[in-house]
Amino acid sequence: MSGNSSTDLYLFKKSLKELKGKKGKGTELISVYVPAGRRLSDISQYLRQELSQSSNIKSKTTMKNVQSAIEVILQRLKLLKEPLEMGVIIFAGMIPRGGPGTEKMEVYVLEPPEPVKTFVYRCDSLFYTDPLEDFIQDNEVYGVILVDRNEATIGTVRGKTITILKKLTSGVPGKFKAGGQSARRLERLIDDAAHQFMVRIGEYATESFMPILEEKKLKGLLLGGPGNTKNEFAEKDYLHHELKKKIIDTFDLCYTEEFGIRELLDKASDLLRDIDLMKEKNLIQRFFKELIKDDGGLSAYGEAQVMKYLEMGAIDTLIVTEDIGITRVTVKCNNCDITQEVNVKTNEMFKFEEQLKTKACPTCGGAMYIDEEKDIIEYLSDLCNMHNTDLIVVSTDTEEGSQISRAFKGMAAILRYKL
């Protein structure tokens, strides 16, 4: 059950981050995007033409590296089975490890989370990763408009991310104590200023949301704020008529800006139950409800306890934060082949490698070496699959995810039964 979208998305984001950090010595890194359903023989033929043309490159070193990268990609294409429902993305090239002469061929084959639509062949000093950014964008977007007499906030909720697009202030004056014609004149001025403010909000909302609507990604609009201003804004013709059709509901709020958006999401939780942000929030709240029980309920937390219970098959749902930063390392003896598995903080891997050089095998005294390194979330995903456990990778951009990261070192769980 662990092979879920949150784990796949985390690993895809991690690969993207690594790829963006790669840089070639010259324009010799190859990026190939193969569209879904495209015949691999057509792609191979195109690459062979590029291989032939690369002989015209003036620099012998660059020519050799480009040709090596194309040949590696051709070899990888032979290993793929058709049809490719999602397509495939391949990166290859010589990446320097240090000074001149330290270059090493690196190749990455990615299965995209969504179908590749367009064929791309690019040779550059960097891998071409721009299309990958589109894959990690959540397709369902909710627009948010918070409005009161004095200010307004326009934003979006996309997956786990809240983005404030625009903050506006009205300049509408407060009430004055005046009588007769002065009172009526001031009232007209205030009403006109309020009307103009609503017009501005509508214009910015149209500018912000119409492009998303045209891409068919706008799931709906949520309006909120204190008082009656939001209702007036919703009922009158301040919004583009196509956006008015997307209004889901209006909500009474105490705040505007980001606090207001979070308050609105709480109040709209039943409507938004399916979006990632609410799923995450509800799951973590479920964990905390167990935690505060007198006997700790069905909660577990911390690396040691969670790993123990997971290997026992006692965990129903495992919660891990994206920033956990741990690598699962398999250490092996070069003499007797005894192995050990340990968790190492990713930013301390160099220190661990240096310390390992001075350690001897506990069985035969032989030298120890690192046999395998694996991202802890990928390792946990495999374990969860074995034990029918749900693995949810949560963002630390949310308040709840940040709590799991800070208080429980990025790892918490809900048990199947009391231990």
Swiss-Prot record:
GO molecular function: translation release factor activity, codon specific
Any one cellular-component term (Gene Ontology): cytoplasm
Tree of life domain: Archaea
Chief place where the protein resides: cytoplasm
Keywords assigned: Cytoplasm, Protein biosynthesis
Subcellular location: Cytoplasm
Xref: Pfam families: eRF1_1, eRF1_2, eRF1_3
SS bond partners: none
HAMAP family, alphabetized: Rel_fact_arch_1 (MF_00424)
Subunit structure: Heterodimer of two subunits, one of which binds GTP.
Its biological purpose: Directs the termination of nascent peptide synthesis (translation) in response to the termination codons UAA, UAG and UGA.
Protein name as catalogued: Peptide chain release factor subunit 1
Lineage: Archaea, Methanobacteriati, Methanobacteriota, Methanomada group, Methanococci
